[in-house]
Amino acid sequence: VADLAAPQPRAPRRWLLLAAALLVPLALVSLLVGAGPLPLGSLLSDPQALQVLAVSRIPRTAAVLLTGAAMAVAGVIMQLLVRNKFVEPGTTGTSEAAMLGLLAVTLMAPGAPILVKMLAAAGAALAGTGVFMLLARRIPPHQVLLIPLSGLVYGGLLMAVATFIAIEGGLLQYLGVWMSGEFSGILAGRYELLWLAGGLALLSYFAADQFTIAGLGRDVSLNLGLRYGQVLGFGIVTVSLVSSLVIVTVGMLPFIGLVVPNLVSRLMGDNLRESLPVVAAAGAGLLLVCDILGRVLRYPYEIPAGTVFGIFGAAVFLYLLLGRRAGG
């Protein structure tokens, strides 16, 4: 038995090393692909090529990696807190609430600093997530599919309110930009808030065991001595902050927090401390693939990364829902 059990601890490390090994060539491709050619040879002799790399390509690649990792981690946290594998910030009204808060502050204080806009979006996301948590508690636990469907309806209601406000305030174009989820406008000096999202994802790793226990439910958590309310609050604040930071910087990116944790869970199981680094790396890698595809499919034009991932994510979401329904 000991011989059979010995290889098990290495499995998570292998998946993490594989994910990291794939990220390196993907990041290199991302640095070289864009509206203008950037040959490797020119980087040593052409100052303009170096400037493009430093001002545009490196910030964009970093923004994609940080966003993918943070949104994937936010998704797995939300799934544990709600105890449902079919939820993420985009299916619980969190993203829509953040967008509503961003729209409100843009309407009332158009010249507000980006940090103020982020805080307004975070406050709205926090309130929106809290409302969803209250709604989810009223749904019987065995109604697994009803929770994400209710979240989609709730998010749709928030989006309808945001659209109405945008039309009345003449901000419909802004709303369209925030919904697109694209990285073409990322430059040095315009993405640095995403490092905070990455920091929150890293901080969540140190609370992985607490999140795992919280995923067992309130009563079990309290019996095990967990401060359930504090863990729940930390998780909701983390998810809300990550969602608002991403929306303020690049716009809405649906399904990352739903698809990635489910795919990793099928490969590694549900040990969050072991799987969370792989979830972050997989989220970063998948979003980077979608961003690269968006740049090359209609070159020299771009398809937003959110659109590309939305197609992939929607297909996986339907597969998971239908698979769950077929399995009873």
Where does each model-flagged region fall?
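Alpha-helical transmembrane segments in inner-membrane proteins
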Residues: 2-328
